[in-house]
Amino acid sequence: MSFRDALNLPSSEITDESVYRDRRRLLQLLALTPALGVAGCAEADPPPPPKTVVTPAQARSGFRTAEELTRLEDVTSYNNFYEFGTDKTDPSKAAKTLKLSPWTVKVGGECEKPGSLSLDELLKGIASEERIYRLRCVEGWSMVIPWTGVPLGEVLKRFAPTSKAKYVAFTTLADPQQMPGVRYRSINWPYREGLRIDEAMHPLTLLATGLYGKPLPQQNGAPLRLVVPWKYGFKSIKSIVEIRFVEKMPETAWHDLQPSEYGFFSNVNPAVDHPRWSQKTERRIAGTASKLFAERIATKPFNGYADQVASLYAGMDLKKWF
């Protein structure tokens, strides 16, 4: 079965309006300031991950939530996907230019079975699952989304990662012909993200191919994106074209851009504020005829998935390794 076939809200109304403007202003400033950027990556290595075992029951308990789903029209029209523009409504308008077939994902690095595969080859034989996850943006808003996809760990095992594979690095397509935002130096393209290997193998980590029972729309990261529900949304990289097993912590786009504001781990943590706004609360996207946001709610550690993932970070200083 092929994984491909395949809306307009008020723009730039995030958390407090100033938060949204601050994040855009940072991108504009850095685009004009070549001296800023890669500095800050030369940090001490984090402590090694503890030996943890996640039971099937623990994992399953995080696969669904009874919270009210965010409306499909909001999920598909209120997006961060800077390859298509920095306004929230830009991706739903501009991403229609993204060609989804053919789509190839290159897998390599510290593994015994590297290769370049079509999407169907990559996912062949792995049962698709529905997961209803909370999504928490670093900007202070959140959604509840029914995703369809496969466990990332099941895909990665096929490539037989070696003992040197301590991290997994991901890369988004960067094609200025299809992605107008790539023509501007708002980010050091291509967009890159990474996970520690145990995070990537965790049962909650999903390679998503759809939402609301349909293939992913282009603006939501089609045809293949990551969903890591206990981390801020920018870790859930979209439109993936490359996966690499690496020994050292990989460079990631937002950390590369501003390391003091966007850590590599970026676990949702209400006890660690962003330097320019609080992370203690969030505003759930709950669009109605009269308003886009519902009332503020308290943000939970690890976005409410602490029972499933907190053990991955036992002994780590989460304020240092934010």
From Swiss-Prot:
Which UniProt keywords are given for this protein, alphabetically ordered? Metal-binding, Molybdenum, Oxidoreductase, Periplasm, Signal
Q: Main location per UniProt?
A: periplasm
Instruction: Write down the required cofactor(s).
Output: Mo-molybdopterin
Any binding details for the cofactor? Binds 1 Mo-molybdopterin (Mo-MPT) cofactor per subunit.
Cite the Pfam families for this sequence: Oxidored_molyb
Say if the entry is tagged with keyword Cell inner membrane: no
Q: How is it modified after translation?
A: Predicted to be exported by the Tat system. The position of the signal peptide cleavage has not been experimentally proven.
Any one of the GO CC terms = periplasmic space
For molecular function, the Gene Ontology terms on record are: metal ion binding; molybdopterin cofactor binding; oxidoreductase activity, acting on a sulfur group of donors, quinone or similar compound as acceptor
Secretion signal: which residues?
1-59
User: One GO biological process from the UniProt record?
Assistant: protein repair
Q: Which reaction does it catalyse?
A: L-methionyl-[protein] + a quinone + H2O = L-methionyl-(S)-S-oxide-[protein] + a quinol; L-methionyl-[protein] + a quinone + H2O = L-methionyl-(R)-S-oxide-[protein] + a quinol
Q: Answer yes or no on keyword Ion transport.
A: no
Location within or outside the cell: Periplasm
For the protein in the UniProt heading, the enzyme class is: oxidoreductase
Q: Where does Mo-molybdopterin bind?
A: 79, 82-83, 137, 172, 220, 225, 236-238
Provide the E.C. number(s) assigned to this enzyme.
Answer: 1.8.5.-
Family per record: Belongs to the MsrP family.
Q: What does this protein do?
A: Part of the MsrPQ system that repairs oxidized periplasmic proteins containing methionine sulfoxide residues (Met-O), using respiratory chain electrons. Thus protects these proteins from oxidative-stress damage caused by reactive species of oxygen and chlorine generated by the host defense mechanisms. MsrPQ is essential for the maintenance of envelope integrity under bleach stress, rescuing a wide series of structurally unrelated periplasmic proteins from methionine oxidation.
Q: How does it assemble?
A: Heterodimer of a catalytic subunit (MsrP) and a heme-binding subunit (MsrQ).
Q: Write the protein's name.
A: Protein-methionine-sulfoxide reductase catalytic subunit MsrP
Q: Which taxonomic lineage is given here?
A: Bacteria, Pseudomonadati, Pseudomonadota, Gammaproteobacteria, Lysobacterales
Gene name?
Answer: msrP
